[in-house]
């Protein structure tokens, strides 16, 4: 989603592959997969992002997500 990242493509792709493997292992349909991933995002925002930063971080994440799925 990010244009520039402090993480390598290898790091990001490895985590994505593991997350997708878990979803495949459970044969999770798309709606369940999105629900589970969304709950993970919520958990991270609530537990890893300071309360005073959550609104901005959430808005930035939502904007990046929206931009990553746009079809021109």
From Swiss-Prot:
Any Pfam family matching the protein: DUF1414
Disulfide bond residue pairs: none
Superkingdom assignment: Bacteria
NCBIfam families: PRK13689.1
Family recorded in the similarity comment: Belongs to the UPF0352 family.
This protein's name: UPF0352 protein Shal_2512
Record organism: Shewanella halifaxensis (strain HAW-EB4)
